[in-house]
Design a protein with these regions (language model features):
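N-terminal subdomain of nucleotide-sugar transferases
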Residues: 1-56
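Active-site proximal beta-strand in glycosyltransferases
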Residues: 4, 93-95, 108-128, 143, ...
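Hydrophobic residues at beta-strand termini and immediately following loops
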Residues: 39, 58-60, 179
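Carbohydrate-associated surface elements
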Residues: 42, 163, 182
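A short helix/loop element that forms part of the nucleotide-sugar donor recognition site in Leloir-type
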Residues: 49, 189-204
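An amphipathic, basic-hydrophobic alpha-helix
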Residues: 62-94, 101-109, 113, 140-149, ...
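Helix N-cap/beta->alpha junction signal
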Residues: 98-100, 161-162
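Nucleotide-sugar donor phosphate/pyrophosphate-binding loop at the beta->alpha transition
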Residues: 116-117, 126-153, 159, 166, ...
Length: 206
């Protein structure tokens, strides 16, 4: 059975576009007989691990910055325990949603080392704004910095729309194609069925 792991800093029961997109991908993959794991943030008092409708959900400990809008991973004992559990799996594909969270960097780093394929799906079309000139400037510096780090771990980027692909160009990233909210399962299946293992191609040790 093929196995896919999806890193998404935010997920249900938090409601938003990325959360719904992640859920839809997971359900569509599941219908294809694929084993799906979601790695998200433990924003509220939810369990660190549970299985919902056949989908395994790991919730990494985090700081709830900006009232939960910007969950930031806590690299503590609980984090290390959950990551050890994940490293025991053999994933065919790791999908990381968005690229500007610390969670995203964790996802692409994990995917590069422990999965056959490793991709990022972009959801944004502009910089985040908190309507404060100084904080917005700091956000831009941070976003460019973390995107640079993400690019070092992953070279396959997609967008949920053409506008997202164009926004990737702002960071000197050439997006491959779109994976719309409707989810083009043919594209996902093509990724899963490609024979080349990125770890072997780039001599990445486990």
């Amino acid at each position: 059975m093929k196995k896919v792991c999806i890193f998404s800093a935010q997920y249900l029961p938090t409601v938003g576009g990325v959360e719904r997109y992640t859920y839809n991908i997971a359900k569509q993959l599941q219908k294809k007989g694929i084993d799906v794991t979601i790695v998200t943030s433990r924003i509220s008092k939810l369990k660190e691990f549970e299985i919902e409708n056949g989908i395994k959900i790991y919730r990494l400990p985090c700081y709830n910055l900006m009232n939960g809008r910007f969950p930031t991973v806590k690299f503590n004992g609980e984090y290390r325990k959950l990551m050890r559990m994940l490293k025991k799996q053999k994933y065919d594909l790791v999908i990381t949603n968005t690229r500007f969270y610390i969670h995203s960097l964790v996802g692409v780093t994990f995917g590069r080392k422990y999965a056959k394929r490793n991709i990022v799906i972009e959801h944004g079309t502009s910089h985040m704004s908190v309507h404060n000139a100084i904080l917005d400037k700091m956000e831009r510096i941070f976003e460019h910095g973390i995107t640079w780090l993400v690019k070092r771990q992953c070279n396959e980027f997609y967008g949920v729309s053409q506008a997202c692909l164009e926004w990737l160009g702002h960071f000197h990233i050439n997006g491959i194609s779109t994976l719309y909210n409707a989810v083009d399962m043919d594209d996902i299946n093509n990724l899963l069925n490609r024979k080349d293992d990125m770890r072997d191609k780039y001599s990445i040790p486990e």
